[in-house]
Design a protein with these regions (language model features):
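Alpha-helical transmembrane segments and membrane-interface helix-loop junctions
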Residues: 1-173
Length: 173
């Protein structure tokens, strides 16, 4: 189990590095676009449509790609009062069950995102002219990445559960 986890973690490390780079680039582009829009609107008393729309689409990608990183790092907001009261092995099982429930939700989330992309394949956005399916593609992309991160979380917790059952006192998953 530890070997499988090692290879999955190495692969996800690479995915996370790419995601962090893409998120950083998207954030810089968003700041530049919004700054441009503010200058255009309040200094030059002019406006355009594309900048606000593009910033909104970039924000959706940033949020969903960032959510995948957050799942992997256990960084999502959670109420863990009851979870922390459990013994370590029971906590592992509870995390696995909750993560499996999250995966079920994410499968539906991805399916909805794919349906939305397919239904909007022939329409374009009014401001930028890009296909709406590109804007909505963040849903299945983010969902799949969150599922992959969730699988890694499950493997970490199961590895910890097994190793604690084999008599180890402290386990780093």
């Amino acid at each position: 189990m530890r070997t499988v986890l090692h290879y999955v973690a190495k692969g996800m490390d690479g995915v996370e590095r790419i995601l962090r780079l893409l998120i950083g680039i998207a954030m810089v582009i968003m700041v530049v676009i919004i700054f441009y829009q503010v200058i255009l609107r309040y200094v030059l008393n002019s406006s355009n449509i594309w900048s606000e729309e593009l910033a909104r689409y970039l924000m959706c990608y940033v949020v969903l790609l960032g959510a995948a990183v957050a799942v992997r790092k256990y960084s999502h907001l959670q109420v863990d009062f009851a979870l922390n009261m459990l013994p370590v092995r029971a906590r592992c099982i509870a995390v696995v069950i909750c993560t499996l429930a999250g995966i079920v939700f994410l499968v539906y989330f991805c399916q909805y995102g794919i349906d939305l992309c397919l239904n909007t394949a022939n329409s374009t956005s009014s401001g930028t002219g890009i296909p709406m399916s590109y804007a909505y593609a963040c849903l299945p992309i983010g969902g799949v990445l969150m599922i992959l991160a969730s699988v890694e979380v499950i493997l970490k917790e199961l590895t910890k559960f097994i190793e604690l059952g084999n008599g180890k006192k402290e386990v780093q998953a």
